[in-house]
A protein has these predicted regions:
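Alpha-helical interaction segments
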Residues: 13-15, 77
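Amphipathic, hydrophobic secondary-structure cores in small proteins
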Residues: 16-18, 22-26, 31-70
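C-terminal structural segments of small proteins and small subunits
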Residues: 58-91
Length: 91
C-alpha cells in the first residue's frame, strides 16, 4: 500500500474554516484512499469536517497531510492543488 506525507502551509485568508474544510472533505471522498491531517501533534481524519475545524489552522499555519491507499498519489496531488489554490476562494 502506498503512503505519502507532505507538509503544506495554509495560505488562504480565513485558514481552514468551514467552507475550506468542506472542500477538503469533498476532495478526499472522490478518491479510493484515506487521508489524515496533523497540526501541532493533533491528528484527524481528512474526511471529517469537524475534525479539520478542531485543528484550528489559521493562515500561515503548517499542516501535515498523509494519504494512503490505491489512490494515495492522486489524492495527495489534489489536496496539494486545493490548498495551493486557496481552497478555491481566491486570496
Amino acid at each position: 500500500m502506498t503512503e505519502l506525507s507532505r507538509e503544506l502551509r495554509i495560505i488562504n485568508e480565513k485558514g481552514l474554516h468551514a467552507r475550506a474544510s468542506a472542500r477538503f472533505v469533498e476532495t478526499v471522498e472522490r478518491f479510493d484512499a484515506r487521508a489524515t491531517v496533523e497540526k501541532d501533534g493533533e491528528r484527524v481524519a481528512g474526511d471529517s469536517i469537524m475534525g479539520l475545524l478542531m485543528l484550528v489552522a489559521p493562515r500561515g499555519s503548517t499542516i501535515r497531510i498523509t494519504t494512503s491507499g490505491p489512490d494515495a498519489e492522486p489524492l495527495m496531488q489534489a489536496l496539494t492543488d486545493l490548498v495551493g489554490d486557496y481552497f478555491g476562494e481566491g486570496r
